[in-house]
UniProtKB/Swiss-Prot annotation:
UniProt-listed InterPro entries: Herpes_MCP (IPR000912), Herpes_MCP_upper_sf (IPR023233)
Highest taxon of source: Viruses
Pfam families in the cross-refs: Herpes_MCP
Family affiliation: Belongs to the herpesviridae major capsid protein family.
Organism, scientific name: Elephantid herpesvirus 1 (isolate Asian elephant/Berlin/Kiba/1998)
Self-association and partners: Homomultimer. Makes the hexons and eleven out of twelve pentons. Interacts with triplex proteins 1/TRX1 and 2/TRX2; adjacent capsomers are linked together in groups of three by triplexes, heterotrimeric complexes composed of one molecule of TRX1 and two molecules of TRX2. Interacts with scaffold protein; this interaction allows efficient MCP transport to the host nucleus. Interacts with capsid vertex component 2/CVC2. Interacts with the small capsomere-interacting protein/SCP.
Cystines in this chain: none
Record's function text: Self-assembles to form an icosahedral capsid with a T=16 symmetry, about 200 nm in diameter, and consisting of 150 hexons and 12 pentons (total of 162 capsomers). Hexons form the edges and faces of the capsid and are each composed of six MCP molecules. In contrast, one penton is found at each of the 12 vertices. Eleven of the pentons are MCP pentamers, while the last vertex is occupied by the portal complex.
Gene Ontology cellular-component annotations: host cell nucleus; T=16 icosahedral viral capsid
Protein's name according to its UniProt entry: Major capsid protein
Molecular function in Gene Ontology: structural molecule activity
Gene from which the chain derives: MCP
Length: 1349
C-alpha cells in the first residue's frame, strides 16, 4: 500500500524531476544517500508551513549525519579511527575511559624473574571538539518553496524552481562543510598526537628510552633531536637518494605503536593482507611519492565499515563496549519523534540492513618494508576554503656564514688544490667577500662595502653603552683579571733622576689587562682559563678593571688603531697578510731589491760596535742643513771608513741624518755603494708612504685631510718619537716639555750668529729653544714611518731613547788641553789635535787618527758643529683629542704620547760615552733594558733582582709617566709584533698598515678599496619556507565519538538562520605514540635568500656622531637613511615603530630576507661556522638549569668562566656573547631600549641575543625534553595515565627550530667564487673545504642542492 502511494507521488512529480537544473545538487545528494532519503525530502515539501518550520531542522540534521559519516568512512583516513556513536556527546566535556590490556610475555628459563601481570589497566581521556556551520534562507524563498508544492499549478512550480535550487544549494553546502569539518577534526587530532619524526626516533633509540629527567638525559635528547632534524627535513626533495627516503618512510612506520583495539577483519585486501596504517599528505607529496616509488604502489579494494559503533555505559559494563549499529535510524521514525516533540530511543533501522555493515573501498596501497600502508591526500578537503590545511606549514630557518676570517698557517692548506687554481695573491689574501646562492640559484656576493650601514653606524662605533654596562660594583668573590691591580694615575710624576731611582728600586708594577691579554695565543684566548676574557667587549675599545684611589674601578678607552687589538684576535700573521693585500691593491711591487739594503741596515743596527760618534754628530746636527754642511768632512769620513772597514751604515739611527745624507751628498766624496743604500732607505720610506695611502681620498672632512682618518701616520696629532724641528700641529694639542707647559710658537729662537750666553747656561736646563724652521708635513709623515715602522722592524725593539749631556760632553771633549793648544803651535802645525775621547770615537768608526792633515780637517769640521749646538734632550708629552670620527664616543678622551726633542736613539750599550748619556725609556719601541742598564746602574740592579723583566715586547716596566697603556697611541700588541718580526720590508709594511685607524670613515675607505678592516663579520639571515608534511598513523589509533547533530534557528522578518552543530569527542587508542609526522617536502621558498643587509640607520634613526658634517658624510657615502631628531616622523618611529619600507621593485625579487652583521674576531675558529651554532658565539641552550631560575640562567649564558656547551671554549666571539659587548648592545632588546630603536624593524639576530627570547626558548625546550622523556615508554611499561600527545611547544620546535634550539644553520658559501662553483659541480664533495686563506662552508640542510635540481 505504502509502495503504491509512493509510486503515485513519483508519477505526479515526474515533470519536475526531468527539469534541467543549473546545478547538479539533486544528483549529488542521491549519490551520497539512499534514494529513499531524497524522495522523502521531496515528499516533505508538501506539508504545511507549520510542519515545515518545526521539522526542517531535524530532517536536515539527519541528512547531514548520514552524508558526513559515509563520506568519512569511505576515505583512507577512516583506517585511523574507530567511529562510535554517543547521543549525549554534548554532555561529555571530559571523559575518562579505562581499558584492560593484555600484556604479551615471553617465557624465560626457570629461576629468572619475570612479570606476573597478564593485564594492565590503561586510562584514556576524551577530548571534545564540536564543529558547526550556519546558513541563511530568506523568508521569501521558503514561501516560494511552500507554494511550489501546495495548491500550485505547474507554471508556478516552473517559475519558482530557483527557490528550490537556492535551498538545495544551502543544504548541500552545509552538509559538505560538515564532511570537511569532520575530516579536519580527525586530521587535527591525529596531528596533536603525532610528534615529529626526529623526536619520536630519539624516544625509540636505545639511549632515548630513559624516563629519568635529569640534565644528562635532557642534553642527550636535545643533541639527538638536533642531529636528526636536518636528516629528515625536505627528504622528498633529495630525489638523488631514494634509498634514504625509503629508509625514513620505513622508520616512520616502525616507530609508531599499535592500537589497544584492532579489528583484524577490517581494512584487509582481497588477498588477506592487513593495512597497517595510512600515510596522509598533500597532493604534491603524494605525486612525488607515487612517481618515485611507482613499483611499490598499487590500487586495491579493502574491506571497510559502513556503520559506526555505539558508546554504552552501564553499571554492568564499567569499561567500554562497542556495538555496531546502523549509521542512521529509520528516517520516518526520526521525523515522527520530531513532529511529536517527544524524545525516546530509536528502534533498529529498517532503512538499511544490519548485515550490510561492511563494504569495500578502493584505496592506494604502498608496500613500505614489510608494512602495507594506505595513501591519502586531503587537498580536496581544503581546496577553495578559508581553512588552512594543517599539513601545510611555514618553516622558519636561520642561516649564518662568516666573511673575513683569517686561517692560520697551521690550517692554511688546500683540500681543493686539484680542482681549483687561484692566483697566488687571491689564494693567500684574507678574504673580504663571501659568495652564496639565492633561491633562484643566482650567485650572490656580500662584501664589507655591503655591511657599511652597520659598520659605519654611530651605535656600532660607540663604546659608551658597553662602558656603562661594564661599569659596576665589584661583588665579593667576583673573578677579576689580574690586570685590575694596575694603578691608574691620571697625573703621574715626571721621571726625574730621583724618581727613576725610586721606581726601579721597587718591585715591578702589576701588568695591565692589555699586557695579560697578549700573553695568550690563538685559541687559548677563547678558553675559560683566560681571566681577562670578560674585558673584551668591542674591537675598537679597551676595557679593564683598574685601581683608582685604592678601589677597583673601570676604564674604557679607544684603541685608536688596528694594531692595538690583542694578538690573539689579530695575530701577527694576519697583520702581515693584510699588509700584503694592501700592497696588491695599491698596484705597487714588493721591493725585493731593497732587501740587501735592509739586511745591511739590520746588521748595522744590531752591531754592538755601532760607532758612538754617530750619536754625537746626529745630536749636534739635529736636522739642521747648515750644521750638516759644516760637518760634511766628518760625516764623509765616518761613512766611508765604517762602510769600508766594518760594512756598516753609520747614522741610520736618526731619520734626519738619513734624509740629509740621501738628498745632500749626491756629488760628494761619499762612496757610491754606501750612498746607494742611504738613497734606498729614503726610497723605502716613500714606498711605505704610498702603501699606507691606499684607499685614501682627496679633500678634507671637518678640517682634516681624508688620509688623516685612514692612517695615524698622517694624523698631525701624532708626532714622531724623535723631533728636531716642530711640525705644524693642531691647535687643540697640548705639549709639555720636561713636565712644563710649552707654547711651541712662543719658544725661544736659536740665533747661531750671536753668542747667546743664556742659552749656553740652559743647555742642561728645561727651557726649550727652536730653530726658525717649521718642518714640512710630508717630512713629518716620513719621520713617523721611519721611527714607528722601519726602525722597530729592523731592531726588534733593541734600541733605547737617550739624551746626550752636552753640558758635560762638550767641555770634556773639546775644551781641554788636547784640543786647545797655544796659538804658536796652531801656526806652526796648522792642525787640531783630538782629545783622547774624540780619538777613541773616531777610531771606533774606522777613522784613522794617525795622519794629522786628515785629522785636522776632520776636527775642524767637528768643531764647526759646536757653532750650531742644540741643548740636552727635552721629554715632550703631547696630549689631545682624537680625530672627529673617533671622538664621538668619548669626547673628553685625551690620547698621550711622548717624544724626545733633540734626543737620539741608542743602538747598543755605549762604552765610550756611557757617562755622558742619559737613557730615557720614553717609548716601548725604544726601551731596551740591556741598553738602558749600561747608562743607569739602578736599572742593572733592577734587572738582576727581576730577570723576568728583561724583555723588549713591552714587558719591561717604565715609569708611569711614560707607560699609560690605555691612553697611549701605541700599545702592547705593537711591541709584541715588532719584538719577534723578521727584519724585512714585509715587517715594515705590516707595522705601517697596523697604524690604520678604527673609525667609521676609515672603515668606509678600507671597504671601498677592498681592504680588510681588521675584523670579520658573521652574517645572519632568516628565511621562510612553505613545507608540506607527511602524517603516518597506525590502524585504529583513535576513537571518534559522535553525537547526533542538532539544529537551531534564528528567525527574523526577512530571513531565517540555521545553525548546525555536531559534537565530536576523540580518544587516543595507541599503546604509545601511534602517529608520526615528517616535514618532508619543500614546496616553495617564501623569502629571497638574498643579500639585503640591514640598515642600522633605520633601526637606530637618531644615533649621531655629534658632528653634522660628519653625520651627513657618513650617511651619504654609506647609503644610510637620513633622519633628524626634530622630525615628527622620527619621534613617531621611536614611540610606535615603523615598518621597514621596501623601496625596490618587489615584483622582481619577492620578499627580502634581511641579513644582519655581528662583528667577529678574524681568529674565530672556522669549524664553529661549519656546524649549527649560535651566531652570537656562545650557546644559549641551557638544559642543566631550570629556566625559571633566572640568576642561574643568566650566569650560564654570560659567565665565560664556564665552558661553552658546543665548543668547550668559552666563546667563539667575545664581541657578541659577553653581556654588554657590542653585539649584545646592538641586538639585545634589554639594551636597545637605552639607545632608541625602531621596534617594528625585523631583526634575525634578536632571537639569539634578547634575554627574554632566550629565556622563553629555554623554558620551552626544558619543558619539551622533560615531557617527552617522561613519555619514552609505552602505556604498558610506563605510567598507565600518561597521555601520548604532542606536548606544548612541539609546533614551535617544528616551525621555528632555530629559535627553540638557539642555533642557526651554516649556509653553503665560500670566500672565493671558484671554490663555490667547483663545489656544486658534479660530483659534489659534501664537505666543508679550505684553499689556503680561502674557505668553503658546506650546508647542513642541502637547500642549495635542492634549488640546483
Amino acid at each position: 500500500m505504502e509502495r503504491d502511494v509512493d509510486a503515485d507521488i513519483r508519477l505526479g512529480s515526474e515533470l519536475l524531476s526531468k527539469y534541467p537544473l543549473d546545478i547538479n545538487v539533486a544528483a549529488l545528494i542521491r549519490n551520497y544517500t539512499a534514494g529513499e532519503l531524497f524522495d522523502n525530502l521531496r515528499l516533505f515539501f508538501g506539508a504545511s508551513p507549520e510542519d515545515y518550520n518545526l521539522q526542517f531542522e531535524a530532517i536536515f540534521g539527519i541528512y547531514c549525519n548520514k552524508l558526513e559519516w559515509i563520506h568519512f568512512l569511505g576515505t583512507a583516513l577512516g583506517i585511523t579511527s574507530h567511529v562510535v556513536r554517543f547521543p549525549d556527546a554534548e554532555k561529555l566535556s571530559v571523559g575518562k575511559i579505562v581499558f584492560n590490556v593484555t600484556i604479551p610475555r615471553v617465557a624465560v628459563p626457570s629461576g629468572v624473574p619475570n612479570t606476573k601481570n597478564a593485564t594492565a589497566v590503561v586510562v584514556k581521556y576524551t577530548e571534545r571538539m564540536p564543529i558547526g556551520i550556519s546558513f541563511e534562507l530568506s523568508f521569501a524563498a521558503l514561501e516560494k518553496l511552500r507554494l511550489s508544492f501546495q495548491d500550485a499549478t505547474l507554471l508556478d512550480k516552473l517559475i519558482n524552481i530557483q527557490a528550490i535550487n537556492n535551498t538545495l544549494q544551502c543544504i548541500n553546502n552545509s552538509a559538505n562543510a560538515l564532511q570537511r569539518g569532520l575530516i579536519n577534526v580527525v586530521l587535527t587530532k591525529l596531528l596533536h598526537k603525532a610528534p615529529p619524526f626526529f623526536i619520536l626516533k630519539y624516544l625509540e633509540e636505545p639511549t632515548g628510552g630513559i624516563s629519568s629527567n635529569n640534565s644528562v638525559n635532557r642534553s642527550n635528547a636535545v643533541f639527538s633531536i638536533k642531529s636528526l632534524l636536518p636528516q629528515c627535513l625536505f627528504i622528498l626533495n633529495r630525489v638523488e637518494n631514494k634509498t634514504s627516503i625509503l629508509n625514513i618512510l620505513t622508520e616512520m612506520t616502525a616507530l609508531v605503536k599499535h592500537s589497544i583495539m584492532v579489528d583484524s577483519s577490517l581494512y584487509t585486501t582481497s588477498g588477506g593482507d592487513e593495512v597497517s596504517g595510512v600515510l596522509v599528505t598533500t597532493s604534491n607529496v603524494l605525486n612525488v611519492i607515487t612517481n618515485m616509488f611507482s613499483k611499490l604502489i598499487h590500487k586495491a579494494s579493502v574491506v571497510a565499515p559502513v556503520a559506526y559503533g555505539e558508546f554504552i555505559m552501564s553499571k554492568e559494563n564499567a569499561v567500554t563496549a562497542l556495538a555496531h549499529h546502523a549509521i542512521i535510524a529509520d528516517f520516518d521514525q526520526y521525523v515522527q519523534n520530531a513532529q511529536n516533540l517527544t524524545a525516546g530511543p530509536l528502534k533498529k533501522s529498517n532503512f538499511l540492513e544490519m548485515g550490510q555493515d561492511r563494504s569495500t573501498i578502493s584505496v592506494q596501497l604502498m608496500q613500505i618494508g614489510d608494512t602495507l600502508v594506505a595513501l591519502e591526500q586531503l587537498d580536496k578537503v581544503y581546496r577553495n576554503t578559508m581553512t588552512h590545511n594543517p599539513l601545510d606549514n611555514r618553516l622558519e630557518l636561520t642561516f649564518h656564514t662568516v666573511i673575513g676570517l683569517h686561517l692560520p698557517k697551521s690550517i692554511s692548506y688546500s683540500t681543493m688544490d686539484a680542482k681549483v687554481s687561484l692566483n697566488s695573491t687571491i689564494r693567500n689574501n684574507v678574504p673580504t667577500s663571501i659568495y652564496f646562492y639565492d633561491k633562484d640559484f643566482t650567485l650572490q656576493k656580500v662584501e664589507f662595502t655591503d655591511c657599511l650601514r652597520t659598520l659605519c653606524h654611530p651605535i656600532f662605533n660607540d663604546g659608551q653603552v658597553c662602558a656603562r654596562i661594564f661599569t659596576r660594583e665589584i661583588k665579593d668573590g667576583e673573578r677579576l683579571c689580574d690586570g685590575h691591580q694596575y694603578v691608574l694615575d691620571n697625573d703621574p710624576p715626571y721621571p726625574n733622576e730621583q724618581h727613576m731611582r725610586n721606581f726601579y728600586g721597587d718591585a715591578p708594577p702589576p701588568m695591565t689587562t692589555n699586557q695579560l691579554k697578549n700573553e695568550y695565543q690563538d685559541l687559548e684566548f677563547f678558553k675559560p682559563s683566560n681571566k681577562c676574557l670578560y674585558t673584551e667587549l668591542h674591537p675598537m675599545y679597551d676595557f679593564s678593571d683598574v685601581m683608582i684611589d685604592e678601589a677597583v674601578g673601570q676604564i674604557c678607552t679607544p684603541r685608536i688603531m688596528i694594531g692595538n687589538m690583542p694578538q690573539a684576535l689579530a695575530p701577527s700573521e694576519f697583520q702581515e697578510i693584510r699588509s700584503m693585500q694592501i700592497l696588491e691593491i695599491s698596484k705597487n711591487v714588493y721591493p725585493q731589491l731593497y732587501e740587501t739594503t735592509v739586511g745591511l741596515a739590520t746588521q748595522t743596527l744590531n752591531n754592538p760596535e755601532y760607532p758612538e760618534i754617530c750619536y754625537v754628530i746626529s745630536v749636534l746636527v739635529h736636522g739642521n742643513r747648515d750644521a750638516f754642511a759644516a760637518a760634511h768632512t766628518l760625516i764623509v769620513a765616518c761613512i766611508n771608513n765604517a762602510y769600508t772597514t766594518k760594512n756598516m751604515l753609520p747614522f741610520i739611527h736618526d731619520f734626519d741624518m738619513v734624509r740629509l745624507i740621501a738628498n745632500n751628498m749626491t756629488d760628494s766624496r761619499i762612496l757610491s755603494d754606501a750612498h746607494m743604500h742611504y738613497k734606498r732607505l729614503w726610497s723605502l720610506i716613500g714606498f711605505l708612504k704610498k702603501l699606507v695611502e691606499t684607499g685614501g681620498l682627496h679633500g678634507h672632512l671637518v678640517d682634516d685631510p681624508m688620509l688623516c682618518y685612514l692612517n695615524a701616520l698622517f694624523d698631525k696629532r701624532l708626532l714622531p718619537p724623535i723631533i728636531h724641528h716642530f711640525p705644524a700641529m693642531k691647535q687643540d694639542m697640548n705639549v709639555k716639555a720636561n713636565n712644563r707647559p710649552l707654547n711651541i710658537r712662543g719658544a725661544e729662537l736659536r740665533d747661531y750668529d750671536v753668542s747667546n750666553l743664556e742659552r749656553m747656561i740652559n743647555v742642561g736646563g728645561h727651557v726649550v729653544y727652536r730653530d726658525d724652521i717649521i718642518e714640512a708635513e710630508d717630512l713629518t709623515v716620513s719621520s713617523k714611518i721611519y721611527y714607528y715602522c722601519m726602525l722597530p722592524a729592523l731592531t726588534n725593539n733593541h734600541m733605547c731613547g737617550a739624551s746626550l749631556l752636552l753640558n758635560q760632553f762638550i767641555p770634556d771633549g773639546f775644551f781641554n788641553s788636547d784640543f786647545i793648544k797655544p796659538e804658536a803651535l796652531y801656526a806652526a802645525e796648522q792642525t787640531f789635535e783630538a782629545s783622547v775621547m774624540l780619538r777613541r770615537l773616531l777610531e771606533q768608526a774606522g777613522v784613522s787618527t794617525a795622519r794629522r792633515p786628515e785629522l785636522h780637517e776632520i776636527m775642524t769640521s767637528f768643531f764647526r758643529l759646536l757653532l750650531r749646538m742644540p741643548e740636552n734632550a727635552r721629554v715632550l708629552e703631547i696630549t689631545g683629542p682624537l680625530d672627529h670620527a673617533q671622538r664621538h664616543c668619548m669626547p673628553a678622551f685625551q690620547a698621550v704620547h711622548h717624544s724626545l726633542y733633540d734626543g737620539f736613539l741608542l743602538v747598543a750599550p755605549p762604552l765610550i760615552l756611557a757617562e755622558y748619556i742619559q737613557a730615557i725609556p720614553f717609548h716601548k719601541f725604544y726601551s731596551d733594558p740591556v741598553i738602558a742598564q749600561a747608562c743607569a746602574p739602578y736599572i742593572r740592579e733592577f734587572l738582576t733582582r727581576y730577570p723576568q723583566c728583561n724583555r723588549t715586547d713591552g714587558g719591561f716596566p717604565t715609569p708611569p709617566y711614560f707607560s699609560r697603556e690605555y691612553f697611549n697611541w701605541h700599545r702592547t700588541p705593537f711591541f709584541k709584533y715588532s719584538d719577534t718580526c723578521l727584519n724585512t720590508v714585509k715587517s715594515m709594511m705590516t707595522l705601517a698598515c697596523m697604524h690604520t685607524k678604527f673609525s667609521p670613515v676609515s672603515t668606509y675607505l678600507q671597504s671601498r678599496a677592498r681592504i680588510h678592516p681588521g675584523f670579520a663579520v658573521t652574517l645572519v639571515r632568516t628565511d621562510l619556507f612553505d613545507v608540506e608534511r607527511i602524517l603516518y598513523s597506525s590502524k585504529s589509533s583513535m576513537s571518534v565519538i559522535i553525537g547526533d547533530p542538532y539544529v537551531y534557528k534564528e528567525k527574523t522578518d526577512i530571513h531565517t538562520t540555521y545553525h548546525i552543530t555536531q559534537d565530536i569527542s576523540t580518544v587516543d587508542m595507541g599503546m604509545g605514540y601511534s602517529a608520526v609526522t615528517c616535514p618532508a617536502y619543500l614546496r616553495r621558498i617564501v623569502s629571497d635568500m638574498g643579500a639585503t643587509l640591514q640598515d642600522l640607520f633605520k633601526v637606530f634613526p637618531v644615533a649621531s656622531f655629534g658632528n653634522d658634517e660628519l653625520d651627513e658624510w657618513i650617511r651619504t657615502h654609506t647609503g644610510g637613511t637620513h633622519a633628524s631628531l626634530f622630525d615628527p616622523n622620527t619621534i613617531d618611529i621611536l614611540t610606535f615603530g615603523q615598518v621597514n619600507v621596501n623601496e625596490q621593485p618587489g615584483i622582481l625579487i619577492g620578499q627580502k630576507a634581511v641579513v644582519e652583521c655581528v662583528v667577529t674576531p678574524v681568529t674565530a675558529p672556522l669549524h664553529y661556522f661549519k656546524i649549527p651554532n649560535n651566531p652570537r658565539g656562545r650557546a644559549s641552550c641551557t638544559l642543566a638549569i631550570d629556566p625559571e631560575r633566572k640568576q642561574d640562567l643568566f650566569r650560564v649564558i654570560y659567565d665565560h668562566s664556564i665552558p661553552d656547551a658546543q665548543s668547550f671554549l668559552s666563546t667563539a666571539n667575545p664581541w657578541g656573547s659577553i653581556w654588554g659587548s657590542i653585539g649584545d648592545v646592538m641586538y639585545n632588546e634589554f639594551h636597545r631600549e637605552q639607545i632608541g630603536y625602531n621596534s617594528r624593524i625585523y631583526s634575525p639576530c634578536k632571537q639569539f641575543f634578547s634575554l627574554d627570547d632566550i629565556t622563553i626558548s629555554n623554558r620551552t625546550l626544558f619543558k619539551i625534553t622533560g615531557e617527552y622523556n617522561s613519555r619514552s615508554k609505552s602505556c604498558i611499561d610506563g605510567d598507565n595515565e600518561t597521555q601520548y600527545v604532542c606536548v606544548e611547544g612541539t609546533s614551535d620546535m617544528v616551525e621555528k627550530p632555530c629559535i627553540i634550539f638557539q642555533e642557526s644553520y651554516p649556509l653553503l658559501s665560500a670566500s672565493s667564487e671558484g671554490l663555490l662553483e667547483s663545489h656544486i659541480k658534479p660530483p659534489a664533495v659534501r664537505m666543508s673545504e679550505t684553499h689556503f686563506q680561502n674557505y668553503l662552508i658546506e650546508e647542513v640542510i642541502p637547500i642549495t642542492q635542492i634549488l640546483k635540481k
